[in-house]
Amino acid sequence: MGQKINPLGFRLGTTQSHHSLWFAQPKNYSEGLQEDQKIQDCIRNYVQKNMRISSGVEGIARIEIQKRIDLIQVIIYMGFPKLLIEGRSRGIEELQSSVQKRFNSVNRKLNIAITRIAKPYGHPNILAEFIAGQLKNRVSFRKAIKKAIELTEQADTKGIQVQIAGRIDGKEIARVEWIREGRVPLQTIRAKIDYCSYTVRTIYGALGIKIWIFTDEE
């Protein structure tokens, strides 16, 4: 059988870049990793709690972290920043202070910026959240995937592959179903492919969603 490598790690340095940029002594490296994880979890929890409408889509495509000696710069790429910011001018400041409270670094300043993504449904994370929301509402999985593929086609992508595994539609036996639309050249390193795996908890059990989106070729 073909061995599946993670498409993001496979393309690091060519079409993909690291989401965290910092240097540390080997003995402090694990602390830095845990700090990154805490920052990401804290941001996601805050966004979940403070969404303006309960759309079920957080709309976070990715979180980039850059650390210097005296500053931690966090950039949140969101598809729908209005949900968080609209009507709350102090939304970012609140988020900043709640993250700062979580990890007590006195001598480092934390700076959070939110960047809007032009075509949110061209990003697998946002699309996975959309499909997860549909599956939780007991929409049939084929309908959910078809709707998701329609949304990505509007975002000018060249190809998409969606895979769902688990007790689909509450069936007794777990199975894997996948649908591909357009081209998804996983072996071509210069092909810019975005990937995400997402777990959704339904009343029948956990379902795994994997999405590959082929956006461009360099």
Swiss-Prot record:
Every KH type-2 domain range: 43-118
NCBIfam families, per database record: rpsC_bact (TIGR01009)
Sorted UniProt keywords: Chloroplast, Plastid, Ribonucleoprotein, Ribosomal protein, RNA-binding, rRNA-binding
Primary site of residence: plastid
SUBUNIT field: Part of the 30S ribosomal subunit.
GO term, biological process aspect, one: translation
GO cellular component: chloroplast; cytosolic small ribosomal subunit
GO MF terms, alphabetically ordered: rRNA binding; structural constituent of ribosome
Subcellular location: Plastid, Chloroplast
UniProt xrefs under PANTHER family: 30S/40S RIBOSOMAL PROTEIN S3, SMALL RIBOSOMAL SUBUNIT PROTEIN US3C
Gene3D superfamilies: 3.30.300.20, Ribosomal protein S3, C-terminal domain
Protein name stated in the entry: Small ribosomal subunit protein uS3c
InterPro entries associated with the record: KH_dom-like_a/b, KH_dom_type_2, KH_sf_prok-type, Ribosomal_S3_C_sf, Ribosomal_uS3_bac-typ, Ribosomal_uS3_C, Ribosomal_uS3_CS
Protein family: Belongs to the universal ribosomal protein uS3 family.
Pfam families (UniProt xref): Ribosomal_S3_C
Superkingdom of origin: Eukaryota
CDD domains: KH-II_30S_S3
Cell membrane among keywords: no
